[in-house]
Swiss-Prot record:
Quaternary assembly: Part of the 50S ribosomal subunit.
Listed name of the protein: Large ribosomal subunit protein uL16
Annotated region described as Disordered, given as residue ranges: 1-23
HAMAP family: Ribosomal_uL16 (MF_01342)
One function term, GO molecular function aspect: tRNA binding
Function: Binds 23S rRNA and is also seen to make contacts with the A and possibly P site tRNAs.
Native source species: Corynebacterium efficiens (strain DSM 44549 / YS-314 / AJ 12310 / JCM 11189 / NBRC 100395)
Assigned protein family: Belongs to the universal ribosomal protein uL16 family.
InterPro entries according to UniProt: Ribosomal_uL16, Ribosomal_uL16_bact-type, Ribosomal_uL16_CS, Ribosomal_uL16_dom, Ribosomal_uL16_sf
PROSITE patterns: RIBOSOMAL_L16_1, RIBOSOMAL_L16_2
Gene: rplP
Gene Ontology biological-process annotations: translation
Gene Ontology CC terms, in alphabetical order: cytosolic large ribosomal subunit
Amino acid sequence: MLIPKRVKYRRQHRPTRSGISKGGNRVTFGEYGIQALEPAYITNRQIESARIAINRHVKRGGKVWINIFPDRPLTQKPLGVRMGSGKGPVEKWVANVKPGRILFEMSYPDEAMALEALRRAGQKLPCKVRIVKREDQL
């Protein structure tokens, strides 16, 4: 699972989901990529699930890059606990994704298989995504 090795502060305020991605919105490493179309918190489990979906479909011969990292903790108080008495423990780690951000990149010799693998990975993510190619970006 993707989690930070150590953090300066265990609990943070929730990040805002407004605005568009300022950087990381072009395919740079691979030939194809998954681009977010709406804001979302993507957990470390969802990232891992999408990565496994890509690897299971293409098996061998390709390369996958994960361009997001879950570096923000989300806290939650236990069920049935009254308000007050401090902030709850860290429940999960999320990546704050804004529209336009490239989430995964991939290179694979067979284009049809690569696009199908990215489509399957996109179904595991909590936001609308689209598949982009490097040659389409100028």
